[in-house]
Amino acid sequence: MKHIFVLSQFIAIALLSYFGNVLAFDWYVMLQLVVVALGIWAVRSVGENNWSVYPTPNEGSSISATGAYKYVRHPMYTALILFFLPVVLRADGFFSWTIYGVLILTLIVKIIFEERQLIKKHTEYTHFKKVTKKRLIPFVW
């Protein structure tokens, strides 16, 4: 199951990258640079040994509630979604919006699956969910 999530995610990213203009030099690139910084902050906040593209916890992993994880439980996914938003806005076609929707839907289902795995492995994740209430967007979801 975990391979299906990752495969779907990377196919959507590859299609958006192939058919869209990932790094055009327009004002959208500023958003992308800020989002790259968010992604780096998220990786640094969680620690090098705690993150993976797979929605299953690594051996020896722990729960991070600092840095970006103070605001949302999945800031790397937030960064990924926001990074590709300008790509879709530049392309502005039905196909790119559909693939973007598939990417977001894949990440939402992946988050739900991942959180179930985290609760099984880390009992403190239930407390973390109470402290950091939102999954992707502060104050929203």
Stretches with model-predicted labels:
Residues 1-65, 82-141:
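Membrane-anchoring alpha-helices and their flanking helix-loop junctions
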Residues 70-78:
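Histidine-centered phosphotransfer motif of kinases
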